[in-house]
Amino acid sequence: MFTIITGAQFGDEGKGKIVDLLAKDYDIVARFQGGNNAGHTVRVGNEVYKLHLIPSGILLNARVLIGPGVVLNPEVLAKEIAMFEKHGIQVNAEKLGVDAKTSIIMPYHIEMDGLREESREKKIGTTKRGIGYAYIDKVARDEFRMAELVDQERFLARLEELAPQKEKEIATLGGDPKIVRDPALIERYLELGKQFATYITDVSREINKALDEGKHVMAEAAQGTHLDVIHGTQKFVTSSSTIAGSACANLGVGPTRVNNVIAIVKAYITRVGEGPLPTELTGELGERLQKAGGEFGTTTGRGRRCGWFDLPLLKKAIALNGYTEISLTKLDVLTGLNPIRICTGYTFKGENLDYPPELTADLAECMPVYEDLPGWETDLTEVKAFEELPENARNYVKRLEELMEVPINYISVGPGRAQTFKKE
């Protein structure tokens, strides 16, 4: 069985929590895109794990894989492995595999990313972690791959080949080109290469072999649908494809092998950084949602902008991903709000729309059309079953399900592993 999980909004939907919940039924969990510009927070008991590269399935018995569509900062990977080992969780080559073709984020990528963002008159909200520049080099065939990182001779030869051009690019951006051949940084990367040598694998072959043997494989996305580099709200997007089809392309698995595509959907909507958010709540109500939901980025710490549930954006996400089921998160955060609003469409230049316009600039001008539902006052964080929810909370979930026309199978009412239940 092959299952793909993606975020249906702008990221931060709670993918890590749901992956952690479901991973017990899977033999392999694989990350297929992005880098350490995304973050998952998983709570197990009193322990909190903040992950940026290693798939959330690491906390259970699954083998976890990092596919070749990821851009990997080896320093971040080393820190995550050390964090787990500090908690008594061994992350050896039997537990974690990294594809030999995975692109490496070099120190100069991070430098160039920061310089470019600072030079923009209008910021796009990059995390300045070198993600975009690593993807640029992948497309330009100027990348470093994991296979080169773990081979000192190849690594140094590749650096000599690429260094002159990278030094020129950094100088053009107003930076110090010495970072490209900094001896201390080179030595550190060679050390990291030795550390990761045993982790190298062929992710496509490993996943296809597992599927042939009847095993269960989960592909885990980072970010969210509307941050997709092609279909998202350009230019306020990430540098990779975040939708379900990307899992097949990046992991090297044929689309006919996909059995399920699960959407992770927040009961409201949030966005980090710049870009349109038609239902955005400003002032006291927006701050209340932000505080109640703990809406601060795992990666950047930036406060997330909050808004009411946006159905047109969800309709587009459903079309782009082909979802078979939905996991609804953070329902508890809406407690105490009355009414609770659902954006069912937009008005744009005198027209009524039930689907987002193609251009980002047009989406920014859309005004939401709302349907109001009565709220509830009961704390939901101890609820263990759908029938235990207050009537108005159940009605809200049912109405979302009706509007999205995709079944909601799981509901989350808190950050802990035990605070998610199946809707039956």
From Swiss-Prot:
Q: Where is the active site?
A: D12 (proton acceptor), H40 (proton donor)
Signal peptide stretch: none
Q: Which residues bind Mg(2+)?
A: D12, G39
Function field:
Plays an important role in the de novo pathway of purine nucleotide biosynthesis. Catalyzes the first committed step in the biosynthesis of AMP from IMP.
Q: How does it assemble?
A: Homodimer.
Q: Which GO terms describe its cellular component?
A: cytoplasm
Q: What is this protein called?
A: Adenylosuccinate synthetase
Q: Which pathway does this chain act in?
A: Purine metabolism; AMP biosynthesis via de novo pathway; AMP from IMP: step 1/2
The record's similarity note reads: Belongs to the adenylosuccinate synthetase family.
Q: Which gene encodes it?
A: purA
PANTHER family on file: ADENYLOSUCCINATE SYNTHETASE
Q: Where along this sequence does the record place binding of GTP? A: 11-17, 39-41, 304, 330-332, 412-414
Which InterPro entries does this UniProt record tie to the protein?
A: Adenylosuccin_syn_GTP-bd, Adenylosuccinate_synth_dom1, Adenylosuccinate_synth_dom2, Adenylosuccinate_synth_dom3, Adenylosuccinate_synthetase, P-loop_NTPase
**SMART domains in UniProt:** Adenylsucc_synt (SM00788)
